[in-house]
Amino acid sequence: MKRPAIVSALICLLLLTACSEPDKPSIALYLAVQRGDLDQLERHLHWGTDINAILPYGQYPLQTAAQNGRIIMVRNLVKHGAEIDRTTTAGDTALDLAILAGRTQVADVLLAAGATLDASALLLKAAANGVTDRDTVRFLIDHGADLEHRNDNGDTPLLVAIRQDNHRLATQLVGQGADVNVRAADGDSALGLATRLNAPELVSLLKRQGARPTSD
């Protein structure tokens, strides 16, 4: 091959490479993740932005993407080395945030990538957060959540739901087999607690399911 031909070939190759290289990102990574801007995320990934650096509001990019249900973003971040089990300043992992937000499809992606799940502890946290999403509850139970697991105060998820007068969650938990005769740390029954807290809907629910008062 003659020299001019070689030079021309090299120039063409350089031009093709330049054309295939994405522009540098024009917005911060945290904005790209918040907005679900895949183009900007790809730019950050190409130009070497640290995807395991904490964002201004205490989360990491993977956690924000997971919480917002950005499946493609989550896959891309994991593929490029995002630390799956890193926790926020509040102690939540990307998987925790996805499940608590009802993003069960994202949760499946994270589990497949090796994320760690403590389903029993997270069900208690979901109850404490006032979660009512049926998919969230079902997902945690399907992944081994113990309905009778207790928090530091001695409450099961059902007792937490009763304390919050969360009828929807209590209904779901009872429907999944939660013990309606469970007792709190002070010996009060679920029915006794609901009665004392003046929660008539919960009292009715528990009685229909055969709950007994404390004195029994």
Which residues does each predicted region cover?
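Post-signal-peptide N-terminal segment of Sec-exported extracytoplasmic proteins
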Residues: 27, 31-80
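Bacterial N-terminal signal peptides that target proteins for export
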Residues: 1-8
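Conserved ankyrin/ankyrin-like repeat signature
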Residues: 40, 72-73, 105-106, 135-136, ...
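Ankyrin repeat domain, specifically the short helix-to-loop turn at the C-terminus of the second helix
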Residues: 42-50, 75-83, 108-116, 138-146, ...
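Ankyrin-repeat boundary/"N-cap" motif
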Residues: 23-31, 54-60, 87-93, 117-127, ...
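C-terminal motif of bacterial Sec signal peptides marking the signal peptidase cleavage site
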Residues: 16-18
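Ankyrin-repeat intra-repeat helix-capping/turn positions
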Residues: 36, 69, 102, 131-132, ...
